[in-house]
Amino acid sequence: CDQNDVEGAEMDVFRPEYNGTGQNGNFYPECYIIPLDGKNQTNLQAAADMMEWLTRNDVKVNVTEKEFTYDGVTYPAGTMIVSMYQAKRSVANGALYDGTLINGWTILYSEGITSFNETRGFDMVTVAEPAAYKSISAVCGDAMDHDDVLAYTNSLGSYFTGEKNKDVVISNASEDSTAAVNELLKAGKTVGMVTSGDHMGDFICSYADYQTVAGKYLLSAAGVDKTSVKAKIITKSPTVYISGTPAESEKGFVYTPQISQSAGWNYDTAAMNLMGFTTTSDVTKADAAAGATKLDAAAKTAVKNGLPYIGYSYSAASSASDLIAGVEYTELDGAMDCLTPVVYPNKTLVNASYIADGDDILYAYGLGYFSKVPASATVLVKSDKTKTPTEGFIPTNTAERAA
């Protein structure tokens, strides 16, 4: 249906079919391949988390018992397969398919985010050829439910390649990699960040120290000779100030403002905890600041005096001009969100790992952007104007919006 509930309208937008050579001609593919090996999977943690998410929602998954080849790539035994031949295929497909880009509607109640592989950062391949699926399904084990998957993911370990008993480069690709580094730093271990070369933006530590975290986290790592790697020592695990800490309630349950009225603060707190950072509501005790809420006066002063700061969301971005002269922030009228291809104009330690992993898709919620920045600013990421977003709600139904 379209915005006016006309049955069958815009079917090509909302239910496109796989009509390529040898493909099934359906909206649903045959299956999805989600690698669980370090050679074919950039983010092992996110892939394992997705396996648990799917089965927690009653989707059945399979794991291959032998290697197989699809589209010229060989996948080992232990690769996850999400079949579309099951009762809950719409649950799985709704999370994994590449989404719908809506331009012609005037308004949308809420974002319709899909493409979990892009938003969560794991590698995935869509299979739409029945012949290929027949070969893949032939090497699959029995369907797994949530209990089966929990046992399976608990048995997964970090991926290591290269020389043992030297130094180890840990790929900076997930919450787990950051949490592992924070654990090492808090234990007084030496960890560096690689400053140049193929591993720029990744972490480096000793093999012995790597082994203390490799069993706890799902990491991708490579043994290297440290003389071939340039790195800067990370002096400590930073304490992070989270903006927008809500005051306690004077009546009733004191934490009501934190639990039910402060979504941004809650998300930021959860994210920092997942990555192993110590957090504080006192900016004078912080080594860095981050958050989705506009900075208060004390935090703003600290940032102006040099405190590193990561701000996102409308609240933070629209107030950037309070911190940096010459910044202008613009929002697209009526737009909701999109998954958009991006480019990286400048390679720095902030974005080097994204560049190395070929991660050129960014999820933008609210569709605000910096329409003007100072000439001296280093731009880390920009939307790629030569490509079309794959998913989202960007209305172009009026001349003003289309412009």
Predicted segments — roles?
Residues 1-403:
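Intrinsic-disorder/low-complexity accessory segments
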